[in-house]
Amino acid sequence: MNRAAFRQALRIVFPGVILGLLGYGTYAYCYILCWNLYHHMGYRAGLALLIVYCILKTLVFIYWAAVVIVGPGKVTGVSPLQIFIPGSEVVDEKAQAIVSRQINPKLPDTYICDGWGMPKWCSECQTHKPDRTHHSAIVGHCVPKMDHMCFWVGTVIGQHNYKIFLQYTTLFSTYLIYTLVTTAVFTPRMGQYRRDRGAPDSIPNGNIIALLILTGAWAAFCTSVCLQSFWGVCRNLTAMEGLGRKQGDMVLVNFRYEGKRIIQPLREEDPLPFDQGFAKNWRQVFGTNPLIWFLPFPVVPAAEDYFSNAYGQKFLERIPARWLEGDGREMAAV
């Protein structure tokens, strides 16, 4: 099995494992805990616990489905950037080579580039890759503002479903914490009930023990993913960008300065390129309507905005200052 086929298989296996564990957890919580509390012990709270559990679990499935159905998005309709002005070439007749040409002044003021200062190019999709775009072999196309591939969900997380993914992880964490806390609170009462009925010990049912272990470990993992994702929203930093910074990946930026195009590597001490402050970062992901913040609807920019990712003001002030300090080079017009 090649790597691509293996990854496609994981897209099915991991969600299948999740569904299996959720099914077992539902049996342990709803029947072993809630039903016994209500039917055998006379606790009306058992019925209330069951209703809240079912509501939370239904919401988890709705938002999970929305993440997969909406998908990460696809880069389409990106017009090729005209790097140089047509007809501006100066040709060396002897060498039969272009010695200079005029750079198009209509290029975006700032963009992530390759070593030549050109916008990133995807050989698979045969298109320019706007800032924050990555090609995903899993979905077979370029994904705008790609965050990561979540095998537990079964799809890639990108610009279109990123907000819904955050809502999903929040709901899933809430569901798991609710299950863990209520199980821990009512399990001793079941033990007391056993003792009152003459049982030699108050050891809880094995399914309850398994439920506590599974929900505890799972809640810790899911909550950490949720908090990390929201921290990324606050800083306008995707998971892939954060990983690249930790690994020291070379990232080049091309920007306009006094009529020149400057190529400069990003430095670890630089401000985050897309960080515009908490309020703007939040609205970029969740939108401006507070009602939409809680509903599973994507916030999608227009296609023509692919090359208009707003850079943070601190970053835009820092890169020309570094150029004046001698860091960077001018883009060659050949």
Curated annotation (Swiss-Prot):
Cross-referenced InterPro entries: Palmitoyltrfase_DHHC, PFA4/ZDH16/20/ERF2-like
Recorded domain comment: The DHHC domain is required for palmitoyltransferase activity.
The protein, known as: Palmitoyltransferase PFA5
Domain of life: Eukaryota
Keywords: Acyltransferase, Lipoprotein, Membrane, Palmitate, Transferase, Transmembrane, Transmembrane helix
Modifications made to the protein after synthesis: Autopalmitoylated.
Disulfide pairings: none
Topology of this chain in the membrane: Multi-pass membrane protein
Segments crossing the lipid bilayer: 12-32, 50-70, 164-184, 207-227
Domain DHHC: 120-170
Family under the similarity heading: Belongs to the DHHC palmitoyltransferase family. PFA5 subfamily.
Native species: Yarrowia lipolytica (strain CLIB 122 / E 150)
Lineage: Eukaryota, Fungi, Dikarya, Ascomycota, Saccharomycotina
GO biological process: protein targeting to membrane
EC number(s) given by UniProt: 2.3.1.225
GO MF term set: protein-cysteine S-palmitoyltransferase activity
Coiled coil regions, renumbered to chain: none
One protein family per Pfam: DHHC
Catalysed reaction, written as an equation: L-cysteinyl-[protein] + hexadecanoyl-CoA = S-hexadecanoyl-L-cysteinyl-[protein] + CoA
CC annotations in GO: endoplasmic reticulum; Golgi apparatus; membrane
Localization per Swiss-Prot or TrEMBL: Membrane
